[in-house]
From Swiss-Prot:
Something else known: Phase reversion of this Pgl system is due in part to the expansion and contraction of an 8-base long guanine tract in this protein (corresponding to residues 259-263). The tract has been observed to be 7, 8 and 9 nucleotides long in different derivatives; a 7-G tract yields a 282 residue and the 9-G tract a 336 residue missense protein.
Catalytic activity: a 2'-deoxyadenosine in DNA + S-adenosyl-L-methionine = an N(6)-methyl-2'-deoxyadenosine in DNA + S-adenosyl-L-homocysteine + H(+)
Gene: pglX
Protein origin, superkingdom: Bacteria
Compositional bias (Basic and acidic residues): 1181-1194
Name this protein carries in UniProt: Adenine-specific methyltransferase PglX
Function: BREX systems (bacteriophage exclusion) provide immunity against bacteriophage. Part of a type 2 BREX system. Probably a DNA methyltransferase, it methylates phage DNA in vitro in an S-adenosyl-L-methionine-dependent manner. Previously called the phage growth limitation (Pgl) system, it confers protection against bacteriophage phiC31. The bacteria allows one cycle of phage infection, but subsequent cycles are impaired, protecting the original bacterial colony. The system undergoes high rates (10(-3) to 10(-4)) of phase reversion, i.e. loss and regain of phiC31 resistance. Probably a toxic component of a type II toxin-antitoxin (TA) system. The toxic activity is inhibited by its cognate antitoxin PglZ.
Organism ancestry: Bacteria, Bacillati, Actinomycetota, Actinomycetes, Kitasatosporales
Enzyme class: transferase
Gene3D superfamilies, alphabetized: Vaccinia Virus protein VP39 (3.40.50.150)
Keywords: Antiviral defense, DNA-binding, Methyltransferase, S-adenosyl-L-methionine, Toxin-antitoxin system, Transferase
GO terms (BP aspect): defense response to virus; DNA modification; methylation
Organism of provenance: Streptomyces coelicolor (strain ATCC BAA-471 / A3(2) / M145)
InterPro entries, A to Z: DNA_methylase_N6_adenine_CS, DUF7008, MethylTrfase_TaqI-like_dom, N4_N6_ade-DNA_methylase, SAM-dependent_MTases_sf
Amino acid sequence: MIDRKALLNDLKQQVKAVEADLGKQVKALDEVGARLRAEYDQARKLGRTAATWNSWLDERVTQVAVAWVLGTVFVRFCEDNRLIPEPYVTGPDNYRRDLAETRYDVYVEADDDPTYRGWLRRAFAELGDGQAGRLLFDSDHNPLYQIPLSHDGARELVEFWRQRDEEGALVHDFTDPLSADGTEGWGTRFLGDLYQDLSEAARKTYALLQTPEFVEEFILDRTMNPAVREFGYEELKMIDPTCGSGHFVLGAFRRLVRLGGENQPGKDVHQRVRAALDSVHGVDINPFAVAIARFRLLVAAMAASGVRTLDEASKYEWPVHLAVGDSLIKSGSQQGSLFGESDDDLTDELAEFKYATEDVGEHPEMLRPGRYHVVVGNPPYITVKDKSLNALYRELYPACAGKYALSVPFAQRFFELAKREDAEGSGYGMVGQITANSFMKREFGTKLIEGYFGHAVELTEVIDTSGAYIPGHGTPTVILVGTRRGGDGRSPVIRTVRSVQGEPVAPENAEEGLVWRAIVEQIDKPGSVSQWVSVDDLDREKYFSKQPWVLADGGQEMLEQINAASHAILKRDLHRIGFYGIMGADDAMSAVPRTFRRNNAESEYVRRLVVGDEVRDFRIADGDDAFHPYGSQRDLVGPDAFPNLAAWLWPYRTELGGRATFSGGTYFADGRPWWEWHQLPKDVGAHAWSLNFAFVATHNHVVLDRSGCAFTRTAPVIKLREGASEEEHLRLLGLLNSSTAGFWLKMVSYPKGGDPVGDEGARVSVHPWSDRYEFTGTKLQEFPLPSEYPTGLGTALDALAQRLAAASPAAVAAEAVPIAGLLREARTRWEAIRSRMIALQEEMDWQVYSLYKLHSEDLRVSEDPDDTNIPELTLGGRAFEIVLARRVAAGEASDEWFKRHNSTPITEIPAHWPAPYREIVQKRIDAIESNRAIGMVERPEYKRRWATEGWDALQEKALRSWLLDRMENRDLWCDENGQPTILTLARLTDALSRDEDFASVAKLYAPRKELAKVVAELITDEHVPFLSALRYKPSGLKKRADWEEVWDLQRKEDAAPDEPAKRKIRDSIPVPPKYTSADFLRPSYWKARGKLDVPKERFVSYGQTNAATPELYGWAGWDHREQAQALATYFTNTALSTKEITPFLAGLLELQPWLSQWHNEFDMLYSGSPADFFAGYRQQKQGEHGLTDDDLRGWRPPAATRRRRAAAKQ
């Protein structure tokens, strides 16, 4: 029996080895390369692909490599299970192993050109003999015949299969004896594992994903069973247009064989098997998926018919209707409309074109619309990366819109293939699919829902499986069942399974998961409700005619209740809602504020840049700044206005100019200024302030920005019209931060994921409150507005948030030396303010319930936010938390909410609260337990988490930042003449020890550590070496060389006499490669520099080795002249050997181009230009030590030596 995991792991390596071999073969064999290139050119011409030649070829090589490896898998399976009489490669016992080797020896002696490749092809030919096996190794289409494996490559593959372990047993033994009745043994499920994970590149390209058998069986129950009841089984036709490794096809085949045996036991078994094979069909774009499906179906047919060898199978006419091709591609005339009409008679050139690996064209009826009684499958969920295919599918399938996922065109295609009604209006084919549920709430799904599903077809069942544990399915899913009936003849209701609660823990057996079992057991019981799901026949028009679909139990009803209390929607009051702008170059244009200060950036062109994660609890957390080259009217300003910033950005000019534009060109090609943002609306007619919200978060977070920050796409803006009052802003701030708004948004928004259950990629989370959602402006602008607003509480919370920020450790440290007394006082204020905010948020939530008529009574303590009857609240003391704590105590709920938020659960209303507040809280608890609407929204999923790092963590971070800022004091890094100087760590520590404020804060930061240790630890992750060879690994040094070449060309461009000459040079400059973390010698260097290698570190380190904490440091705020001065001063004043001075001279050589660029003017200090001075001085030193420029460029640090562990004491 095969070890599935070991086989998969080993074969992954074999595929990589074969890919490498085939890549060499393509280059060595001109005919092969030319043939593939011609195929690619034709495909690109017809719009079948927009991929580059190299990426297309890489994908084809992967397909061929997998085909070679899978071919040998099929051979090995047949050898070990005696499907062929004599082995070609090996066998589990010594006899068959020796026989295989002997047979190969005989072949070598007899054949004119014997190779291992030729021997494997003989094995493939034997397996492919006969009508059923022919498709397995069809030389016209099987990818392995596209590129010949080398003799050595084939030999290594054979030798791999012959490996034995220490006991002499075959490492990969496929023996799986078939039982007498053919129902057990010959298992091929392992091939599904190979299909999904054999090639990482293929898995990503085709979104390979196995459908678990229990899901496949369920969908066949809901589709094939009714089809058999209506049409019978003998003439039934089924297809899986995305068949993958064949799970649905095999499931349908086995059902049909069983039905034939039950209903016609006297009929010849071979005829029954033939009839079942003739009924099932499958198509997949992935050649090796279809190869696996064909092999599995052939083995299943043999088992079902009692045939035990391939030779015997070749005597029967067994049709195998499985084809390779893109089942979405059809003639343009078949594109139809959202209402389902199409003309099936015409063809076009693109529909006729097929890749060499595709054979669907040899099955002309396979994809004929209206042919099938059953259409089932699990279509891919990915978006279409290839631009040509994306446009083609959009043209062929009107349901495609926006950034659609493949689930959209496949939803339409599945129904198109299903049988239409007969003359009497009956006889519709059944369609079933498990698919991504993203179309239900993301914008691209609107046309599919409101157009196609709304009119062209009849959905009969919608089953929310997002809460079920389905291994491998990391994307939330839904099962759709229906027919091709459209228009008025459809049933007014749809059987719907809605979610109540997700799977609490990963089940040992996914099929026995609590949610899945509830779905199976309740699906035929409308009106049933369990802890996990509810089942109802819901009105088609009311629940499914408009986007979004809401499949949370009671969710749609709650939305309608909220909407019914609305007097308008949010977009009525807005100038616009959407992105602030798109920088398009965040790595180059943004950095922490100190980086801009260090480079003397022109402050009027630097703005605070806010990301979504910083928008929390009515305030904006500290973060990065951004280059913002715009005036007050958002008109672009030229580099002359910001010379320091322009110099800082100069190294990235080609990268910035090479950015893609909306037209498909580049900034340079389209004549766009290289320094501008990608997109920045002028917002004429909008208020200067903005409300901003977190685009992806577990809960709704909205802030009011009065300071004119810039925001990334993760923090969209809500702009009111010019002239809007502060009150208009604040009333929306309060409303949009309410739990009611959180509920509404989560019902209509797409869930991004949370804390997953299990480790098999199943998209279920234990705690719904930890699920992140995508809150888009398109959804939010439809938010219903009540007639009144929680303006007073919104205003109070906004003011408290500003006070909270002013009491934070970072704010204290910014205003004064952060001594213990100040921090203690600030902590008291901070905790009190935060507790007050928790209390007022609770008041606001309950006020809003009454505004939307979710509860008849306004359960606030008072209309005055400052009322003393409202106590300060700590987490754990809100009404819903008391209810939750009681459920935890009763063993009915998890206590994770309290653990995660460091709060104490309480089951009784605290006696020290004011009496009016205790009474109100009791009423709130009563409402939660008796009012369904309140019970739905008063849950952790919708209540503000107030998640924070906590004071201690905030204080530690603030103290660390203060200490590091103090260590950057320019005076520390200058000598008595004001010139830059390199310091040893000991000298730096000594200087800092004389700073009483530094010493006292360091003691507060790390009370049990010596100052020297504190300074060393602080600087360890904040420095980057002065020399490339000490920063990068070899791969990074190669990229650095590319960047230096780009900079040389940019300097030539700057020196060119006129614009035509400049443009000619500019057009020849390649966009340099981006760095990755793997290019840097230490993670801290990568963290400081990023993929464009932008210097954002605090300190520069010097030395001769790659050390975590070197002995020599400088300040990163030095310009190139100051860096050169510090280096030259150091090796002038320090006695260094040739070996020791080499890296320092190399550092000076690396600075030379920058000195020539920025410091080439006369300077009295150097009696000439600094560039000339340092060049001459370096050359003098090189001469003294006999070093050439190449010696300096070739210098590398010595390899690190591992210290031997001390011997353990005896």
